[in-house]
């Protein structure tokens, strides 16, 4: 029995030593021994082979579309659709008339919203073209060959018996180092030395945590990286976005107060660096945050602020409405587009269904975390441009660069009801049509 304990202890020491030497130390200093690159190449080959085997099970060889949508929507504005609807009738149409047949337009939109609206599908996992040997996330897939099944079983053993313990070890070290290091740094008086230690702790921790997720990150256009005194805004998929960005540089964070593990991390970070955490439901907190952000931006020696203007996590298929508050405080905006590859794992965090711990466990049992980060050129508010227009301009640039769908809807609809202002806007548009105030609707006769 003693011999068994000795052997187990020796194996554990050897394993931990290899983890520290081959993974932990290189990641702390931002270098790599090439192990992750080899793993990703093997993984890509396996998934390509599995995809080909799966496709042989289909009689129809047509290319599948990776889309969550089942409705082909007409993107034309209300005025154009109603004009086409009226032109399809035989009676005379005069400008400003009310037509009972217009009800078909609203009925069509209503049925589309009932069957599949544009908002709620953004809060569920992205549909995949083919099964990635993780979960059956593709509705079009119904066949698995015996070979693919055996590969899936082998992959299951690798992910849960080898990768999961390794990743939990790295994540535990990274988070513990952040909490302990930030707490110790927080005891130092405010000085350049404290800022230097704080940046070092944050950077090393994020690099360790990124390695714990087998991250393969490509950063593009590094010459546009956010600079001190600026505001970095990015699309939001999960809290891992912070690790992805902070792996390449330090930021002062702004975000919603969380409980549990996330809350512990937030409180530790706030001790060493002037991060801003607030309660979204408290109006007083929101005004206080705005003032603190203005003070932060005015000091060019402070770290750039990282803000996610959507205010909630979206499934990385689209970019939803940017809240104008981030664009009212002044300063230079540094847009950043983040796009994850769902083939290797689903990075989306549905906070209304999954706790932070369960989400991290799911990520640690995925194949890897592969994503691209684009630093876009810095922008400033133009003369005569209000905060809403500025926010929409930045949102459009991020959506275009990341290949994401741009949506006007508020991400707050994830938890709340549609605001009356959205309904009133549609009512006003139709009122202009029947009042003859809309010039785009031309009178026609048949």
From Swiss-Prot:
Q: What class of enzyme is it?
A: transferase
Query: Which keywords belong to this entry?
Result: Acyltransferase, Endoplasmic reticulum, Lipid biosynthesis, Lipid metabolism, Membrane, Phospholipid biosynthesis, Phospholipid metabolism, Transferase, Transmembrane, Transmembrane helix
Q: Which Pfam families does the record match to this protein? A: Acyltransferase
Primary place of residence?
Answer: endoplasmic reticulum
> Which pathway does it take part in?
Glycerolipid metabolism; triacylglycerol biosynthesis; Phospholipid metabolism; CDP-diacylglycerol biosynthesis; CDP-diacylglycerol from sn-glycerol 3-phosphate: step 1/3
Location(s) in or outside the cell? Endoplasmic reticulum membrane
What Enzyme Commission number does this protein have?
2.3.1.15, 2.3.1.51
Q: Does the keyword Cell inner membrane apply?
A: no
One Gene Ontology term of the biological-process aspect is: triglyceride biosynthetic process
* Keyword Lipid biosynthesis carried by entry: yes
**InterPro entries to which the protein is assigned, alphabetical:** LPCAT1-like, Plipid/glycerol_acylTrfase
MF terms in GO: 1-acylglycerol-3-phosphate O-acyltransferase activity; glycerol-3-phosphate O-acyltransferase activity
- At which positions is motif HXXXXD motif? 236-241
Q: Which reaction does it catalyse?
A: sn-glycerol 3-phosphate + an acyl-CoA = a 1-acyl-sn-glycero-3-phosphate + CoA; a 1-acyl-sn-glycero-3-phosphate + an acyl-CoA = a 1,2-diacyl-sn-glycero-3-phosphate + CoA; dodecanoyl-CoA + sn-glycerol 3-phosphate = 1-dodecanoyl-sn-glycerol 3-phosphate + CoA; sn-glycerol 3-phosphate + hexadecanoyl-CoA = 1-hexadecanoyl-sn-glycero-3-phosphate + CoA
One term under GO cellular component: endoplasmic reticulum
> What is the recorded membrane topology of this protein?
Multi-pass membrane protein
Q: Which residues cross the membrane?
A: 11-31, 146-166, 168-188
The UniProt comment on domains reads: The HXXXXD motif is essential for acyltransferase activity and may constitute the binding site for the phosphate moiety of the glycerol-3-phosphate.
What family classification does the UniProt entry report for this protein?
Belongs to the 1-acyl-sn-glycerol-3-phosphate acyltransferase family.
What does this gene product do? Converts glycerol-3-phosphate to 1-acyl-sn-glycerol-3-phosphate (lysophosphatidic acid or LPA) by incorporating an acyl moiety at the sn-1 position of the glycerol backbone. Also converts LPA into 1,2-diacyl-sn-glycerol-3-phosphate (phosphatidic acid or PA) by incorporating an acyl moiety at the sn-2 position of the glycerol backbone. Protects cells against lipotoxicity.
Record's protein name: Glycerol-3-phosphate acyltransferase 3
Please report the organism this UniProt entry assigns to the protein. Answer: Xenopus laevis
